[in-house]
């Protein structure tokens, strides 16, 4: 029995006949008929449209293909437009992937630019077109593809059509903006909208020498990601000199002789030379709607799994379509180039071979460069899951781009969202300076295959110190998520802690040095390595929240407490780093009067006069790259202890909070901040050693009004004395000092002559077991049956120490 295989390539239909004759197989080709030449018409020549046109030619050499584009350009790199405006991409021609002429010649396609389709007639299978001269004509089609893209949102505000107010969507917009900046010598710009395009434009206008103010109606930039992940971007923008107006709406614009004034709902007014509107986009559906095609719930063109619309033989791709989200099945709009190009290939095959290939949808994987930082996301963020009422849990881990001991390891923060029971991955967000893209790409692939957090633990990745760590940030994220699911690490988010802070006991498990640089208000400091010695001070009947810098020491402390019977204990997700960044207030932005971008160096040294002798001073250089907080600031302290007054330390670090910590440290210690700046994720600070605080009247006055809080946990004499020494030292600088005495520490306050009080049985038992007065305190080391403490008291009396 012959086997018949149908093949419809190259405009003919063949039968491949497999015959068996005398123990040999023969493949016979039998031509059955000649196929009718098909005519494909494509509306829109960018991304999805151009991709589909090229694929159509590759699979059907004889077809007639007509590509219609209302603008003068096709197949251009629209994602590169902001970088051409900023001068990062120097040559305009590099944006034009193909010209109409080269594309038409290579693929034998009839490309007609500046030909706009103004009507579709599905019953007649024709479209009406208006050319550049205004002449209208009709073209027939066998199958039609719509790739109209999306249109910028432009609200009907007073003055919005004034000269100098732009949107950016195509090459023509780019040319107008670039020419305007040059001709008008623009020095001040306002970007309205802080999405991907808005922030890319802010960076590139800054790169072109323009001071930029960003106005955003929401409470964060980059709406697709969660607030805690956007907060570091806020800080980075401010460090770069960008003025940031969050939770602000524009009421109207006014053109004046000096430029444009942007008026905000709060009453503020921002002067500018130009304005860029980046409020968002909407699917371009006017043609589809006029033709009677079905629109989806979110306003996009409805398509089925083969990308065919509600009308047979009419297909659609790109920004204009609406398609169910693969994770939820809910309607979804996706304004990204990668899905549009994938759709172009799929739809071409379906148009030629029949509806044989299904589109699985896009989960929304995106990335953006914001000055030195990279921010990327895939899948569903926590706020979207909450909005849709889906049960979820999240984790936040702070890692490094590669092994910390290899030079120039840069911070990298990863947030995962997942099902709290099954561990199914919902989404991921990542911010950092290097290696962000490859982590999100890996996770996106797992999410599309229905992966779980346990798959992250099993992910195999390349490893060498310059590229990653033996435990990659992806694996670390998986470990943490699995601990949360199993109950090994009960957690609390920064937002939950803000609401519950007064109801819990907060324990900072970092070192005393870290604690002194800043902590969550109300927290007590019990370092991880001393946790077991202070169990009696931690209540078992009150909720306890542990935290450290990034979460690891908090987790280890939690395991100690849970192993000792504590049940109502949780670890803060992301540690103090996430909490402090997410809750940090943004400074009130000041509108620029003119001039170029304000640098982070200028911003840092406004209150410090420029020192012409910087290069003449002895400077000790320290590289603290790769160290997490408080590593860099501890290196500063160590270096300052080794130099003389008037000498300087220059330290480079990759911890994002280092520059801020260094400023606070200088304010506290009386040292002088000379300079600070950042470049590509590396923060450089120059500090000059000042005179000791107690001998400098200026330093004393600078410290006045500040307070110091100490906590005495122990009744060991040496530790108590150390606390009092620190307290007296702080008081000597003019600071107000408060000492908290915990259970054991209260023994230090016991008097030799004390009043008689009534005690119950347990009170009497404790009285017998505890020191009767401060004279009975022992040393933590070298007690020698009480001789050690008596020797110390003798020396104190001899030296006149009370």
Regions found by a protein language model. Give the residues of each.
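Beta1-alpha1 glycine-rich phosphate/pyrophosphate-binding loop at the start
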Residues: 37-110, 153, 202-225, 362-365, ...
């Amino acid at each position: 029995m012959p086997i018949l295989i149908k093949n419809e390539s190259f405009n003919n239909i063949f039968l491949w006949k497999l015959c068996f004759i005398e123990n040999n197989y023969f493949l016979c080709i039998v031509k059955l008929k000649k196929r009718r030449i098909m005519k494909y018409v494509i509306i829109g020549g960018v991304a999805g449209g151009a991709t589909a046109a090229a694929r159509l030619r590759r699979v059907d050499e004889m077809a007639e293909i007509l590509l219609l584009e209302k603008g003068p350009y096709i197949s251009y790199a629209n994602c590169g437009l902001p970088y051409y405006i900023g001068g990062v991409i120097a040559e305009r021609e590099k944006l034009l992937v193909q010209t109409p002429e080269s594309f038409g010649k290579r693929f034998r396609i009839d490309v007609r630019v500046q030909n706009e389709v103004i009507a579709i007639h599905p019953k007649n299978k024709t479209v009406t077109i208006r050319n550049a001269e205004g002449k209208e004509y009709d073209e027939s089609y066998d199958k039609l593809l719509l790739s109209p893209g999306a249109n910028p949102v432009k609200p009907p505000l007073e003055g919005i059509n004034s000269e100098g107010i732009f949107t950016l969507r195509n090459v023509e917009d780019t040319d107008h903006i670039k020419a305007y900046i040059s001709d008008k010598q623009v020095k001040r710009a306002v970007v309205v909208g802080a999405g991907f395009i808005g922030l890319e434009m802010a960076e590139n206008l800054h790169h072109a020498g323009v001071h930029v103010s960003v106005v955003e109606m929401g409470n964060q930039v980059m709406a697709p990601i969660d607030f805690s992940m956007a907060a570091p971007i806020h800080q980075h923008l401010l460090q770069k000199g960008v003025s940031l107006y969050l939770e602000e709406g524009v009421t109207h614009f006014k053109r004046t002789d000096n430029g444009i004034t942007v008026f905000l709902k709060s009453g503020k007014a921002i002067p500018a030379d130009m304005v860029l509107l980046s409020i968002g986009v909407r699917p371009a559906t006017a043609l589809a709607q006029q033709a009677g095609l079905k629109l989806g719930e979110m306003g996009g063109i409805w398509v089925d799994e083969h990308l065919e619309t509600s009308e047979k033989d009419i297909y659609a791709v790109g920004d204009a379509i609406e398609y169910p989200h693969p994770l939820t099945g809910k309607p979804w709009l996706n304004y990204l180039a990668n899905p549009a190009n994938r759709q172009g290939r799929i739809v071409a095959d379906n148009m030629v071979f029949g509806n044989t290939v299904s589109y699985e949808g896009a989960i929304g994987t995106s990335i953006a460069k914001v000055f030195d930082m990279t921010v990327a996301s895939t899948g569903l963020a926590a706020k979207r899951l909450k909005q849709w009422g889906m049960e979820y849990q999240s984790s936040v881990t702070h890692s490094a781009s590669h092994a910390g001991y290899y030079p120039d390891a840069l911070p990298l923060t990863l947030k995962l969202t997942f099902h709290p029971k099954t561990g199914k991955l919902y989404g991921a967000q990542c911010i950092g300076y290097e290696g962000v893209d490859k982590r999100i790409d890996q996770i996106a692939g797992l999410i599309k295959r229905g992966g779980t957090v346990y798959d992250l633990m099993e992910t195999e990745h390349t490893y060498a110190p310059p590229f990653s760590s033996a435990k990659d940030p992806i694996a670390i994220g998986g470990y943490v998520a699995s601990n949360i699911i199993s109950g090994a690490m009960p957690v609390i988010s920064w937002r939950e802690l803000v609401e519950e802070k007064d109801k819990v006991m907060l324990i900072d498990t970092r070192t005393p040095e870290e604690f002194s640089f800043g902590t969550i208000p109300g927290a007590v400091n019990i370092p991880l390595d001393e946790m077991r010695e202070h169990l009696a001070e931690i209540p078992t009947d009150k909720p306890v929240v542990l935290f450290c810098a990034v979460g690891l020491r908090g987790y280890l402390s939690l395991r100690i407490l849970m192993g000792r019977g504590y049940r109502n204990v949780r670890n803060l997700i992301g540690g103090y780093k996430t909490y402090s960044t997410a809750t940090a207030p943004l400074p009130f932005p000041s509108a620029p009067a003119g001039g170029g971008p304000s640098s982070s160096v200028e911003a840092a040294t406004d209150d410090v006069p420029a020192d012409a002798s910087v290069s003449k001073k002895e400077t000790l250089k320290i590289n603290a790259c790769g160290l997490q907080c408080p590593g860099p600031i501890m290196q500063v302290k160590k270096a300052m202890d080794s130099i003389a007054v008037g000498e300087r330390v220059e330290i480079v670090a990759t911890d994002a909070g280092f520059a801020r910590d260094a400023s606070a440290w200088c304010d506290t210690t009386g040292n002088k901040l000379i300079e600070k700046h950042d470049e590509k994720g590396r923060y450089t600070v120059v500090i000059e050693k000042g005179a000791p605080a107690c001998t400098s009247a200026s330093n004393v006055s600078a410290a006045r009004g500040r307070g110091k809080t100490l906590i005495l946990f122990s009744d060991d004499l040496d530790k108590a004395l150390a606390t009092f020494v620190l307290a007296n030292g702080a008081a000597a600088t003019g600071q107000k000092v408060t000492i908290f005495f915990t259970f054991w520490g209260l023994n230090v306050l016991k008097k030799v002559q004390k009043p008689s009080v009534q005690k119950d049985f347990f009170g009497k038992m404790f009285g017998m077991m505890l020191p009767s007065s401060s004279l009975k305190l022992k040393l933590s080391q070298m007690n020698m049956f009480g001789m050690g403490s008596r020797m110390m008291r003798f020396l104190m009396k001899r030296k006149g120490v009370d």
